[in-house]
Amino acid sequence: MTFRDLLSVNFEGSRSDGSAGGASAGGSGGGSGGAAASEGRAVDGVPGTAGSGGVVGAGSDENNRSSAGEPGAAGAGGEVNGTAAVGGLVVSAQGVGVGVFLAAFILMAVAGNLLVILSVACNRHLQTVTNYFIVNLAVADLLLSATVLPFSATMEVLGFWAFGRAFCDVWAAVDVLCCTASILSLCTISVDRYVGVRHSLKYPSIMTERKAAAILALLWAVAIVVSVGPLLGWKEPVPPDERFCGITEEAGYAVFSSLCSFYLPMAVIVVMYCRVYVVARSTTRSLEAGVKRERGKASEVVLRIHCRGSSTGTDRGHGAMRSTKGHTFRSSLSLRLLKFSREKKAAKTLAIVVGVFVLCWFPFFFVLPLGSLFPQLKPSEGVFKVIFWLGYFNSCVNPLIYPCSSREFKRAFLRLLRCQCHHSRRRRRPLWRAYGHHWLASNGGPRPDCAPGLGAAPREAPLALPAPEATDTPSAPEAQAPVVGRRKPPYSFRDWRLLGPFRRPTTQLRAKVSSLSQKIRAGSAPCAEAPCALRSEVEAVSLNVPHDAAEGATWQAYELADYSHLRETDI
């Protein structure tokens, strides 16, 4: 039984003239004539003028297409079973149930996609290029859920299109636009994940915000080109009945839209994820083997600055510099493994999304061109409606996949449901944590320049380092290191607070590391005393990983006074 047949209302009644009234289902007779009973599809129904069971009939032609009929005549004893009158329309109990189910379905799709968009907007650590593509997917699904599905559900419940021919064409075009944009977004995400897994360390420089914006603009341009075809006349002849509205089944357009909206993107998606699987399998083995050779996994990330003496370097200094080379190798290997594991996990999450997408959309894009080219192979109306709504179901299920597969999205969802959005002031836990006092360990001892004795450098001439931003946890009481003789540079366009939510964490990390490196290379303020006999020059700044407690203990610890005002810095 199709959705339109759910509106069928059967009643038996005797006419005032003694003849049998027609079984009114919106067909050619709701009591309007003759002894012969007629059946049809409900198109428009209004309670009869005199009979208890009379409804406004709708005439039916040989193809069982509906047209407005005449009010039913008087009928005695007419009875309507299992129906409800809503605004003058008679709807069966099953139709009411279908309407409630579709309303819950639409509300779930709207709420889920809104959660995805707000989660990225309110959490800085989720504002990455990959998540921008996910937000674009959520925007397309939200537009579909809010502008297309309500009218589709209304048509299913009423059994006919009640919004006019012009709006039918617009509705069909927006339907194709949103579905195509959603599918192309999944295609873009798969390419982005392949780049992230294949080039995990170079990914921030390869996939920039500017490139992402250009890709998204091209994506929506392609979706618009695919969707405007029927508006420009590439469609079937317009049916005379304005109460009928459906997707265009013209053979040429059906094949074109299926290729551009589904088959080509699906081919790219399958190829990209096959490549992701191959790269992930080989890279994981090589990285894990390298880390095992270097004894264990990363426990802590620290900043080590490799220095060399500008005049007479001691053996101790050269030994310290040589010993850090192994640490640098191990840290880069471990950091690469950690970075790659995050990329691989994100790829797994998005692979689930793509798998569900294929299951939801493949039946529709298989049946549509097949039925257009070979009408005799068309499925029944009921089967086609199930396949049609299965594609819509993809827009509802995408937001449900993220919290089940991504811990970060799950936490963001929970914070939003608890009305906790800390985007403006509170900072997330830093991805990297650098300890400035390890500069002393790398140099083989306290910095000697501008030092009056064997102790640390005087507090009047500290090494200028960027102070950490305010965090949720209180830090140790340390004085802010002044910068002598330097004017604060003006803010650049990228430093405006207005653009803060659109900056990637990797961009902030790179900027802070560069600033830290430049300030360390510049050294402290000019010293009023004689030039130091032994002055060190920074050779490199790197992130190192101690692999066990014993190795971490070999790095010399210093008291707070020996830090030369180097403080823990979040980068």
From Swiss-Prot:
Biased composition (Gly residues): 19-34, 48-57
InterPro entries membership: ADR_fam (IPR002233), ADRA1D_rcpt (IPR000363), GPCR_Rhodpsn (IPR000276), GPCR_Rhodpsn_7TM (IPR017452)
GO biological process: adenylate cyclase-activating adrenergic receptor signaling pathway; cell-cell signaling; phospholipase C-activating G protein-coupled receptor signaling pathway; positive regulation of cytosolic calcium ion concentration; positive regulation of MAPK cascade; positive regulation of vasoconstriction
Stored PROSITE patterns: G_PROTEIN_RECEP_F1_1, G_PROTEIN_RECEP_F1_2
Segments of skewed composition (Low complexity): 35-47
Database matches in SUPFAM superfamilies: Family A G protein-coupled receptor-like
Membrane topology: Multi-pass membrane protein
Chain segments annotated as transmembrane: 95-120, 133-158, 169-191, 213-237, 251-274, 349-373, 381-405
Family matches, as Pfam families: 7tm_1
Glycosylation site positions: 64, 81
Location in or out of the cell: Cell membrane
Keyword Transmembrane appears in the UniProt entry: yes
Function: This alpha-adrenergic receptor mediates its effect through the influx of extracellular calcium.
Assembly mode: Interacts with FLNA (via filamin repeat 21); increases PKA-mediated phosphorylation of FLNA.
Stated name of the protein: Alpha-1D adrenergic receptor
Source organism of the structure: Sus scrofa (Pig)
